[in-house]
């Protein structure tokens, strides 16, 4: 008998480097044997890069204490063919200092209703909690200065939240919004006032942080 648990779901088209899963089983196979067996069954784009036994109280989802996401914007004129699946091409002028100011305002505990996907009904939107805690944000140039990369670490995230955050930062960079408008969006709770939801392919879930004492 086997019971499964994953850290969480990513939006369709979003990549994951640090997805974590856990399961309970009555099998006597070692963790390494499970790793080899699973990799033999999975498609090449999905790999189990490590496996180990954990304590009975560990759950990949409920033991998670934070997640780190990264969104890559390619700023050059021509996207190299080896990376086009993993970046959003955005060669337009941007005020990156204003974007960094805006990104810093995400840090802390706020109501991210303006940055979340709709549940489909106004009643459901009002009932669900949209308060989230963001631990840190960073906006830096990488890749021979051709890429602008937004990294965010938080306790948990709403559906489409990171992609809406990036879209809003781009609106700040283009001068459509001011950095101080981030604070106003927390109060308004109106997703129509925030930036667009950027495409999923530039986003990757980099890491999931778990409690320290989960190893056997």
What role is predicted for each listed range?
Residues 3-216:
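Structured-RNA-binding interfaces characteristic of tRNA pseudouridine synthases
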